[in-house]
Swiss-Prot record:
Keywords, comma-separated and alphabetical: ATP-binding, Cell shape, Cell wall biogenesis/degradation, Cytoplasm, Ligase, Magnesium, Manganese, Metal-binding, Nucleotide-binding, Peptidoglycan synthesis
Protein's GO biological process: cell wall organization; peptidoglycan biosynthetic process; regulation of cell shape
Protein name (Swiss-Prot/TrEMBL): D-alanine--D-alanine ligase
Location of the ATP-grasp domain: 205-424
GO CC field: cytosol
Residues binding ATP, per UniProt: 237-299
Family the UniProt entry places it in: Belongs to the D-alanine--D-alanine ligase family.
Role according to the record: Cell wall formation.
Enzyme Commission code: 6.3.2.4
Pathway(s) per entry: Cell wall biogenesis; peptidoglycan biosynthesis
SUPFAM superfamilies assigned to the protein according to its UniProt record, in alphabetical order: Glutathione synthetase ATP-binding domain-like, PreATP-grasp domain
Length: 428
């Protein structure tokens, strides 16, 4: 894979070049800063969805209008290190091989933050700093009020906005959003509350139920402390019918999801539930047990580049499974690893009146959680036309086979225009 583009080599020069040292706190290359808006693109992260974030970023960087924006890809390793000059994410794809990850290369340099400096608070250390916890660089935070820092760090320059292409916990859950809020750096996407609430499916349901938006019936279980007998009794008290879907409350990309069918006896049923809860519990101690819905899974892309504007909804689409003999749900492999497993249909093959109902529910759900920027609202449409919200993804996938960009393309907004509108929305 190619190492990060020549623009970064030209910008930062040889590692350790004295001419690039920070002097008097001033950033460098002001002429380039004036020419284009500089956008840090965050990718990778500590979540299970790390590799999907990498693939999404490849799509985003490939679609970004480089006449308007200067993308600055900043990777986050699985153990949380922020780096620049690693492998170029533009070369990553879904080819059925090994999923990509953010790795430290000989040319990688750590990215560190001084929150007090806001949009000028991004700094770069030397390669030797990445793993040197003993020398004070084991953290991603620094204080440039320390004179010693001026001799060892380089300014990344003024950052106009951040595009966090991060999926799952430690990225899509309000944590990174809170950091950027604290720094005063404009960023694309939902704010702290919406990100946190939509990452936690239990609280998504709480908010939507309060807004009068239907969701799938279910119960919430603490995987750290439960008995299968108690869970089964709770399921029966709630009147849930089979099949059930057991899933982590705070995970995405179908990680840890198990379909549980009706058993012939209680003991077998309890065993199945216990196994499913244990699987989900590997990803989150909070586990949802939801009733399977007899309906079609219809997804709608919502766009609201500037917080407070009226959200727009795409034509809803449907993921159609092509392996008709498989009695499976749309799992991780179907989503990302097997391009032949499914295809996207936009608009979904439904009456226009039903499609408009889905769009209306998607907009209402987005507003109920105080959404901003973008989200993909996943719904169930039952045979009688009822629209139920399954979940809200505040940073939906941007892979080549992802619904979000495909839905907007079918609605008349190209991939490049989509990225442009999202970034320019936070710069207004």
């Amino acid at each position: 894979m190619r190492l990060l583009c020549a623009a970064f080599r030209a910008r930062f020069g040889p590692v350790g070049g004295a001419k690039h040292r920070l002097e008097n706190g001033c950033s460098f290359n002001k002429r380039m800063v004036m020419a284009k808006k500089r956008v840090v693109v965050l990718y990778g992260g500590r979540a299970d969805e790390h590799s999907i974030s990498c693939i999404s970023t490849a799509g985003v960087l490939g679609a970004m209008d480089t006449e308007r924006f200067e993308p600055i890809p900043v990777g986050i390793t699985k153990d949380g290190k922020w780096i620049i000059n690693g492998e170029d994410p533009r070369g990553w794809n879904l080819d059925g091989g090994e999923l990509p990850t953010v790795k430290i290369t000989p040319e990688s340099r750590p990215v560190m933050l001084d929150p007090s400096r806001g949009q000028d608070g991004f700094f770069i250390g030397e390669p030797s700093h990445i793993n040197s916890a003993d020398s004070g660089f084991g953290t991603s935070f620094v204080s440039m009020s320390d004179p010693e820092m001026h001799h060892v760090l380089t300014s990344l320059g003024h950052v106009d906005a951040v595009l966090p292409v991060l999926h799952g916990p430690y990225g899509e859950d309000g944590t990174v959003q809170g950091l950027l809020e604290m720094m005063g750096v404009p960023y694309v996407g939902c704010g702290v509350f919406a990100s946190a609430a939509c990452m936690d499916k239990h609280y998504t349901k709480v908010v939507l139920d309060a807004a009068g938006i239907p969701t799938a019936p279910g119960v919430t279980v603490d995987a750290r402390n439960f008995t299968a007998a108690d869970v089964l009794a709770e399921i029966e008290d709630a009147g849930l019918t089979y099949p059930l879907f057991v899933k982590p409350s705070r995970a995405g990309s179908s990680f840890g999801v198990t379909k549980v069918e009706k058993a012939d006896d209680r003991e077998t049923q309890q065993d199945r539930l216990a196994a499913a809860i244990a699987t989900a519990g590997e990803h989150d101690w909070k586990v949802l047990v939801e009733q399977g819905i007899d309906g079609r899974e219809i997804e709608c892309a919502v766009l609201c580049p500037k917080a407070g504007d009226e959200p727009e909804a795409s034509w809803p689409g449907e993921i159609v499974l092509d392996h008709q003999n498989d009695d499976q749900f749309y799992d991780f492999d179907s989503k990302y690893m097997d391009a032949s497993a499914s295809h996207v249909e936009v608009p979904a093959n439904l009456p226009v009146s039903v499609l408009e109902d889905v769009r209306d529910v998607a907009r209402r759900a987005f507003k109920a959680v105080d959404g901003a920027g973008l989200s993909r609202v996943d719904t169930f449409v039952t045979p009688d036309g009822t629209v139920m919200v399954n979940e809200i993804n505040t940073m939906p996938g941007f892979t080549p086979i992802s619904m979000y960009p495909k839905a907007w393309d079918a609605t008349g907004v190209s991939y490049t225009e989509l990225i442009t509108r999202l970034i320019e929305g936070v710069l207004r």
